[in-house]
């Protein structure tokens, strides 16, 4: 039987987990649940994890450093019930080659669903038309200005978990799907369900562009004035990834021409300053980073963590196990 330590503070326990998921874990081993509101007492943390073979972490969990690793010499894996693993791993963790999995796929489902909602709503003009009707304007010619989500070109930037789920959702519609990803081959992208194109071609031909690239040095300011100008008039740009991927001032300058419509869930920094023009432009929908799994959707993470634990105990490959050799290109 595994010795499972849920190294998750009480606040996050209440948001992510419930007794249903604890019972599922208890079927796989002896479960210890962290009984504190913070991780300030290092001795308490170390004693809590001592002897564990599996540790479950989440946002805010302490770094799995040498002290923690020395306290659990038989540690097999860390199940990270959150996105990026970088906040919880240490050089010692990497050196010891401990297995680790994250919940990016569970979070990514919510992100992709939000991006799809943005796409359909923006094409149909929901935001502008609602603003007009609220102001007493009834647009008789609205049929001539909105776009059906049919027989249009949709571009997905990056073929990670979110991008893949976005394509999966898009395949339910009669749209042409294109993907830019510098790592994946044309065959791999075809297997996902899209056609591989260059970034420039994607921006040029697509009516909707949805950004799902990770925040890494290679993607910093990936979209800028030199390529945003390639986008079609009346195209929709959606960013539910990271604010750093788009040069914000260049985007604002392009939006001020009125050519594009943007749905922005992430900025750099967050929140944007009060006088940021994204807050006031009529052709922008700006939301406070809600695309990821939130509220009741956090239970997806608990489910995924349980499933990964079951795979680990069953000797199967964990679905979202992270290759520590590829950390540099991961968010």
Where are these regions (language model features)?
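Rossmann-like dinucleotide-binding domain for NAD(H)/NADP(H)
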Residues: 100-101, 234-331
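N-terminal Rossmann-fold NAD(P) dinucleotide-binding loop
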Residues: 163-164
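Glycine-rich, N-terminal phosphate-binding loop of Rossmann-like dinucleotide-binding domains
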Residues: 58-59, 82, 211-213, 240-241, ...
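Alpha-helix C-terminal capping/helix-to-coil transition sites in glycosyltransferase folds
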Residues: 50-51, 71-74, 204-205, 230-233, ...
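Glycine-rich Rossmann-fold phosphate-binding loop(s) that bind the pyrophosphate
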Residues: 159-160
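Rossmann-like adenosine-cofactor binding region
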Residues: 63-66, 183-277
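Phosphate-binding beta-alpha-beta segment of Rossmann-like dinucleotide-binding domains, i.e.
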Residues: 103-153, 168
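An N-terminal-biased, well-structured beta-alpha scaffold segment characteristic
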Residues: 1-101, 224
């Amino acid at each position: 039987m595994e010795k499972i330590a849920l190294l998750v503070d009480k606040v996050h326990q209440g948001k992510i987990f419930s007794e249903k998921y604890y019972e599922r874990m208890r079927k796989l081993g002896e479960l210890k649940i962290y009984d504190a509101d913070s991780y300030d007492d290092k001795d308490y943390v170390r004693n809590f994890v001592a002897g564990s073979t599996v540790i479950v972490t989440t946002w805010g969990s302490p770094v799995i450093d040498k002290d923690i690793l020395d306290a659990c010499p038989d540690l097999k894996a860390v199940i990270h019930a959150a996105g990026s693993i970088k906040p919880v791993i240490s050089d010692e963790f990497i050196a010891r080659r401990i297995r680790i999995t994250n919940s990016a796929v569970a979070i990514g489902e919510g992100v992709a669903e939000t991006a799809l909602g943005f796409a359909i709503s923006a094409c149909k003009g929901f935001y502008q038309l609602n603003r007009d009707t609220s102001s007493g304007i009834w647009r008789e010619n609205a049929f001539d200005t909105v776009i059906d989500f049919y027989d249009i070109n949709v571009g997905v930037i990056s073929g990670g978990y979110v991008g893949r789920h976005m394509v999966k959702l898009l395949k339910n519609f009669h749209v042409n799907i294109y993907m830019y990803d510098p790592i994946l081959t044309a065959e791999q992208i075809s297997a996902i369900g899209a056609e591989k194109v260059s970034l420039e071609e994607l921006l040029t031909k697509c009516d909707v562009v949805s950004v799902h690239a990770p925040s890494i040095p290679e993607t910093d300011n990936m979209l800028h004035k030199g390529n945003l100008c390639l986008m079609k008039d009346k195209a929709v740009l959606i960013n539910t990834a990271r604010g750093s991927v788009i040069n914000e001032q260049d985007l604002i300058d392009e939006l001020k021409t009125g050519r594009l419509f943007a749905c922005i869930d992430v900025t750099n920094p967050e929140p944007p300053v009060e006088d940021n023009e994204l807050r006031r432009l009529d052709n922008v929908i700006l939301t406070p980073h809600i695309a990821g799994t939130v509220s009741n959707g956090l239970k997806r993470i608990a489910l995924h963590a349980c499933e990964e634990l079951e795979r680990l105990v069953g000797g199967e490959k964990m679905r979202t196990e992270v290759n520590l050799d590829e950390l540099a290109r991961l968010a």
